[in-house]
UniProtKB/Swiss-Prot annotation:
Entry-linked InterPro entries: Atg22-like (IPR024671), ATG22/LtaA_families (IPR050495), MFS_dom (IPR020846), MFS_trans_sf (IPR036259)
Cell membrane is among the record's keywords: yes
Source species of the chain: Bacillus subtilis (strain 168)
Keywords: Cell membrane, Membrane, Transmembrane, Transmembrane helix, Transport
Record family assignment: Belongs to the major facilitator superfamily.
Residue ranges that the Swiss-Prot or TrEMBL entry lists as coiled coil: none
PROSITE patterns documented for this protein: MFS
MF term (GO), any: transmembrane transporter activity
GO CC annotations, alphabetized: plasma membrane
UniProt-recorded name of the protein: Uncharacterized MFS-type transporter YxiO
Length: 428
């Protein structure tokens, strides 16, 4: 019988509850609408503002992709993982709070602080993901990782509901606050939520697997980084999984971050978009947990196939989408898989990596994900500019899922795993 979740597991899971508010309010819902409105008031066309947002996302992910591997390598040393985690959380929370105080006419400055907040959010996730090996054994990783995403979707709905309520009341002129001010209040609420519920993670989760500190940490970290690059190619399962992940997670991330902007381009009202995104969060919560449970029965790889195929259907459907009802259907399709595919990717990879070098390898997990996240938004941005049609840009993402699922077919089936044990026994 499955034992109850430990204090360390619950504290780790609770960070998903904390940072998912940023993911829905800032990345997906309110900020894109606030930014699109601010840019439109400054005379920027819908297609151009979508392109600028795509470029901004690409820049932030490129910066983190450059920093991720070396920071992860340094963080493998004793006592370093939590320090780096705390630094990026602090940067993310502070810059998110700053979005609440920048006048809407300064839309370029908004993009700048959004970039910093995105780097803080994603940077903290590198170390958060790597802590999975410290808080739970391999046999529970799928379950704990999926619980994190599930709880994250549930928790994010609370600040999201508050944000929607304030914005809708402002639109109806029920409260003496402008829609712009109401939107910015949601950024401050998100920052406070993120910071508050990070505290249990800081207090109760500790680095169990590490390398003893030595002289010249930075220099030696660069040396170890080079060694890791060579070793990754030697681990066939690990390398193939990262390659598949590079493509399919790009499509997933791009759809998540650009969905609200796309809906706005189709003429769907901001109120409808916010409600749709809220329902998406509610639906996604149980499906994330279901993915984790089904992975215990059918293997994580099988459930990854399911998620990728659903996203391929999303790309095709998005091309023909015209009405708000179509967007509802699209959102529900995404909701069934977005949490599950991310949770199982995280736990699948965690089972393959040497635990003492988890940050080092998760740094590469991050760089594969982040470089992929550059390609997707750029594909959206360039296609939108060339064709003037957001639907064509979204449809083009299907090629990423096709390539990803083909490569994933060559990855050995998930086991408990012999590969991971062999890697842990190797002198690194």
């Amino acid at each position: 019988m499955m034992k109850r979740f430990t204090k360390q597991e619950n504290s780790w899971v609770l960070y998903d509850w904390a940072n998912s508010a940023y993911s829905i309010v800032v990345t997906t819902a309110v900020f894109p609408l606030f930014y699109k409105s601010a840019a439109a008031e400054s005379g920027v066309s819908a297609a151009q503002s979508t392109a600028y947002l795509g470029y901004t996302i690409a820049i932030s992910t490129f910066i983190l992709a450059m920093l991720g591997p070396i920071l992860g390598t340094i963080a493998d040393y004793e006592g370093c993982k939590k320090k780096f985690f705390g630094f990026f959380v602090s940067a993310g929370v502070a810059s998110t709070a700053m979005l609440a105080f920048i006048p809407s006419e300064h839309w370029l400055l908004l993009l700048l602080f959004y970039t910093v907040s995105a780097i803080g959010f994603s940077g903290a996730n590198v170390f958060y993901d790597a802590f999975l090996v410290d808080v739970t054994p391999e046999k529970r990783m799928n379950l704990v990782s999926a619980r994190g995403f599930g709880l994250g979707y549930i928790g994010s709905t609370i600040p999201f509901i508050i944000s929607i309520a304030v914005i809708l009341l402002a639109q109806a002129e029920t409260i003496p606050v402008s829609v712009s001010a109401a939107s910015q209040l949601s950024f401050f609420i998100t920052a406070a939520w993120w910071g508050l519920f990070t505290i249990p993670m800081i207090k109760h989760v500790h680095q169990r697997y590490y390398i003893k500190k030595e002289p010249h940490i930075v220099i030696n970290s660069f040396k170890r980084l080079g060694q890791t690059m060579k070793r990754i190619r030697q681990y066939r399962a690990l390398f193939l999984f990262l390659l598949a992940y590079f493509f399919y997670i790009d499509g997933v991330g791009t759809i998540i971050t650009m969905s609200t902007s796309y809906g706005s381009d189709l003429g769907i009202g901001s109120s409808s978009l916010l409600i749709i995104l809220f329902v998406t969060q509610v639906v996604a919560a149980p499906f994330s947990i279901i993915y984790g449970k089904l992975a215990e029965r059918f293997t994580g790889k099988t459930m990854l196939y399911v998620g990728i195929v659903i996203y391929m259907i999303v790309c095709v459907y998005a091309y023909f989408m015209e009405t708000t009802l179509d967007f509802w259907i699209l959102a529900m399709l995404v909701a069934t898989s977005q949490g599950g595919i991310q949770a199982l990717s995280r736990s699948y990879f965690a089972k393959l990596v040497p635990k003492r070098h988890a940050n080092e390898f998760f740094g590469f997990y991050n760089i594969f994900g982040k470089f992929a996240s550059i390609m997707g938004p750029l594909l959206i941005a360039v296609t939108a500019q060339l064709t003037g049609k957001s639907s064509t840009a979204v449809f083009s993402l299907i090629i990423l899922f096709v390539i990803g699922i083909v490569i994933l077919a060559f990855v050995p089936e998930e086991t408990s795993t012999d590969v991971s044990q062999q890697q842990n026994d190797l002198p690194l």
